[in-house]
Each structure stands twice: as structure tokens, then as C-alpha cells.
């Protein structure tokens, strides 16, 4: 009975009355151990009294049995006490370690969460600061010529297009009929129309420009300039460009050509994701500006303007095919169906070579059939410019170098076509013949009188 009471007391009290610390549990167990030892001494005293009574009653056999039983009970009690002690210490140690580990893990997790939140906040702040710095300091970091608005209008390309229109006017203008006002109108109108076309191009391709490393930093992509404002600005520039030329009746046709060229450029932009033939359609956009200048100079579509337009058209094919080969993977990732993406490199090289070879005899063919009295050096430079585009396929020059060669050869050819121009026979000779006829008629009339 006493043993069962001790075990019940241990099982009931156990960890319930202990504190959370290890030392508190040990103090409790020491007190409990002292109580259990007093119970054992009482059993011993009871054994002694009982043994004396038995000795007096001469019950030796029963006394021995009882003593053996009491000794066994003592052993059981001691064993149970030590087992409970070990289990009790294990429980205290496990609870203390688990509490400390849980507290440490919770502290670590809390610290990690705090650090992650701080890192996220820092990243958001850094991203906001970067966006603000991009929007505010883009002009400072890249310079004025490469600022957001200059990038939006593609200033280098716009200047290039304007120079081709100027070359068309200067090359086609008869000697003595050069007009600086008309040239200024053609230059400004072409410049504004080209700006409008480039803005429309970027506004249409915003979603695709994000996918290309070459165009991912454009102002409409990163949000430096609002798309709605850009669209309104492009319409305003187109209106100003057309009005600058159309205000003069003789320049209404060149102004109409400029406006139609903007519409063609927008249509070509959508075709870049539809068919590989977009390069040949887009080449018309680059061939029209010199025709604008020549029509402004002569008032009609003359042979010199057609030659410059055809030369520009042929020149653009190897030029843009070389660029598409350099940016093949970027075009593929953005979903553009360029010839370099849909066909092998050998096919692209053969197409470029065919156009370059066709451009060599082209100036002399025009001169033979139209006899527009262009300087032979100018014709030779046009042929050499086309030959330079064919040279890389013979010497195995990279497409990137071919692209650079095409950029160098074109302005040289246009400059010489303006510098080495000659008076046109169908202007000077016809005028002289009319004057001679008038003089002869006057002389004949005087003789009759």
C-alpha cells in the first residue's frame, strides 16, 4: 500500500508542480526523496517492533518471511525512486532544451523575417530610387543628344533621313534655280515627319521592345515619357511637317509624300512580326526622302531623283540584313520574323550579295537610258558603294563590320552626288533653244517691216 501511494504521488505531482527551470525540478525531487526515505525508516521501525513481538511470541518462521518481504519492498521502492529520478531529470532536461531551442528558433525566425522585410523594403526603395534616377538623370548620364526625347525621335536616324532629302534637292536642282527657302522647308518638313514616324514606331512596339536588350531602355518602355503624350506629340509633329511644306503650293506633293511615308512606316512596323518580307517593304520608307527633295527641286519626278531613290532602296537591303544577323537572337526572342530568324545564314548572305551586285551597274544603266548628265565620278561612287557591300561576302567580313561599312559609304556617295553635280541638258539646252527661236522670230519680223 505504501509503495502504491508513493508511485501515485510521483505520477500525480511529476512535472506539474515543478518550475520551468532545471534547478527547480531538482529541489522538488530532493524534498520528495527525503519524504520517501522517512517512510522507509518508518517501515524499518515497524519491522523492528514487529520482530520483537514475534520473538516474544516465538514466531521465528513468520518473522523471517515478513522481513524478507519488507526488504524486497524496500528494494522495489528504491528502484522506483531512482527510475523516477532519472525520468524526471530527463523530462526536465528535454523540456528545458526544447523551450530554449524553440525560443532560439523563434527568435531566429523572427530575426530572419525582420531581415527579409528590411531587405524587401531596401530593394523597393532602391528600385524606386533607380527609376527616379533613370527618369531624372537620363539626360545627364547620357548627354543631351541621347536624352529621352532625343531617343524617342531617334535623332541619328532622323538626321540621316533629312540629309538624304537635302541630297535629293541639291542633286536635282538646276543651276541658278537654287532656293534656300525651299531647301529649309524641305529640311524642316522632312525632319518633323521623320520624328513623327519614329515616335509612332516606338509607341507601337513598346511591348516588344521590353524583350530586347537593345531597346529595353527606351523612354516609352521604362516610363520616362507617357505613351499618350508621345502619340499626341507624333500627330502634332506630322501636322507641322506636312504644313511646313504644303504652305507653298509647289511643295504640296513633297509634303504629301512625307505624310504617306509616315503611314507606310507604321504599317511596316506591324509587318515585322508577320512576314520576312518586311525588310523590302520598309526599304521604301528609306527610299522616299531623296525623292521628296528631288520633287521639291524640279516639281516633277525626274531621273536623278529616281536614281537616288533606287540607290537608297538597294543599299538598305544588305544594311538591314546585316543588322538582323547581329541581333538574330534578340529578334527571335521578341517575336520578329526577320529573314535571319526564319532562314539560315547562307540564305541571308546570298540575298545580301545579290542586292549588292545589282547595285553596281545600276547608276550606269540610269545614265544610259535617261542621259541626265550626272558627273561620272558620282556614278562611280554609287557603284563602289554597292561593291563595298558585296566585299564582305568575298573576304568573310563579319555582319557587324558590313553594317559599319554601309553607314560610311552612304554619306560619302550622297556628298559627292551633291558636290559634283552638273547642269542638266534638258533644262539649259531647252531654254537656250527657246531663246534662239524667239530671237530669230524677232529678227525676221524686223526684216519684213
Curated annotation (Swiss-Prot):
The keyword Mitochondrion applies. Residues 99-138 have a biased composition (Low complexity). It is an enzyme of class 2 (transferase). Its EC number is 2.5.1.-. Residues 99-140 are annotated as: Disordered. Keywords: Heme biosynthesis, Membrane, Mitochondrion, Transferase, Transit peptide, Transmembrane, Transmembrane helix. The keyword Transferase applies. GO terms for molecular function: protoheme IX farnesyltransferase activity. One of its GO terms (cellular component) is mitochondrion. Its main location: mitochondrion. It is a multi-pass membrane protein. The chain crosses the membrane at residues 163-183, 245-267, 279-299, 303-323, 352-372, 374-394, 402-422. GO terms for biological process: heme A biosynthetic process. It is found in: Mitochondrion membrane. InterPro entries: Protohaem_IX_farnesylTrfase, Protohaem_IX_farnesylTrfase_mt, UbiA_prenyltransferase, UbiA_sf. PANTHER family: PROTOHEME IX FARNESYLTRANSFERASE, MITOCHONDRIAL. Belongs to the UbiA prenyltransferase family. Converts protoheme IX and farnesyl diphosphate to heme O. This is Probable protoheme IX farnesyltransferase, mitochondrial.
Amino acid at each position: 500500500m505504501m509503495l502504491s501511494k508513493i508511485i501515485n504521488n510521483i505520477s500525480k505531482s511529476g512535472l506539474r508542480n515543478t518550475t520551468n527551470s532545471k534547478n527547480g525540478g531538482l529541489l522538488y525531487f530532493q524534498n520528495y526523496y527525503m519524504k520517501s526515505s522517512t517512510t522507509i525508516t518508518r517501515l524499518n521501525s515497524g519491522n523492528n517492533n514487529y520482530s520483537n513481538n514475534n520473538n516474544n511470541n516465538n514466531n521465528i518462521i513468520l518473522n523471517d518471511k515478513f522481513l524478507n518481504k519488507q526488504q524486497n519492498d524496500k528494494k522495489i521502492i528504491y528502484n522506483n525512486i531512482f527510475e523516477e529520478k532519472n525520468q524526471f531529470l530527463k523530462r526536465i532536461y528535454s523540456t528545458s532544451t526544447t523551450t530554449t531551442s524553440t525560443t532560439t528558433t523563434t527568435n531566429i525566425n523572427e530575426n530572419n523575417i525582420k531581415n527579409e522585410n528590411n531587405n524587401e523594403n531596401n530593394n523597393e526603395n532602391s528600385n524606386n530610387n533607380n527609376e527616379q534616377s533613370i527618369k531624372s538623370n537620363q539626360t545627364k548620364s547620357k548627354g543631351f543628344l541621347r536624352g529621352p526625347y532625343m531617343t524617342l525621335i531617334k535623332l541619328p536616324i532622323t538626321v540621316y533621313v533629312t540629309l538624304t532629302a537635302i541630297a535629293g534637292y541639291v542633286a536635282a536642282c538646276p543651276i541658278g534655280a537654287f532656293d534656300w527657302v525651299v531647301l529649309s522647308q524641305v529640311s524642316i518638313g522632312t525632319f518633323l515627319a521623320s520624328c513623327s514616324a519614329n515616335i509612332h514606331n516606338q509607341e507601337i512596339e513598346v511591348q516588344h521592345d521590353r524583350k530586347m536588350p537593345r531597346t529595353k531602355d527606351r523612354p516609352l518602355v521604362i516610363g520616362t515619357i507617357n505613351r499618350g503624350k508621345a502619340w499626341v506629340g507624333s500627330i502634332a509633329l506630322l501636322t507641322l511637317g506636312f504644313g511646313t511644306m504644303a504652305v507653298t503650293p509647289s511643295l504640296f506633293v513633297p509634303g504629301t509624300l512625307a505624310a504617306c511615308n509616315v503611314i507606310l512606316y507604321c504599317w511596316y512596323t506591324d509587318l515585322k512580326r508577320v512576314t520576312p518580307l518586311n525588310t523590302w517593304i520598309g526599304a521604301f520608307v528609306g527610299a522616299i526622302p531623296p525623292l521628296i527633295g528631288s520633287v521639291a527641286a524640279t516639281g516633277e519626278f525626274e531621273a536623278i531623283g529616281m536614281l537616288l531613290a533606287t540607290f537608297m532602296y538597294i543599299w538598305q537591303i544588305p544594311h538591314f540584313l546585316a543588322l538582323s544577323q547581329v541581333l538574330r537572337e534578340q529578334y527571335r526572342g521578341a517575336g520578329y520574323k526577320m529573314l535571319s530568324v526564319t532562314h539560315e545564314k547562307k540564305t541571308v548572305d546570298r540575298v545580301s550579295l545579290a542586292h549588292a551586285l545589282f547595285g553596281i551597274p545600276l547608276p550606269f544603266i540610269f545614265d544610259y537610258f535617261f542621259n541626265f548628265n550626272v558627273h561620272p565620278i558620282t556614278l562611280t561612287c554609287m557603284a563602289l558603294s554597292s561593291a563595298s557591300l558585296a566585299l564582305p561576302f568575298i573576304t568573310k567580313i563579319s555582319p557587324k563590320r558590313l553594317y559599319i561599312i554601309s553607314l560610311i559609304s552612304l554619306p560619302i556617295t550622297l556628298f559627292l552626288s551633291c558636290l559634283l553635280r552638273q547642269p542638266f541638258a534638258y533644262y539649259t539646252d531647252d531654254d537656250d533653244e527657246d531663246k534662239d527661236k524667239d530671237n530669230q522670230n524677232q529678227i525676221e519680223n524686223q526684216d519684213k517691216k
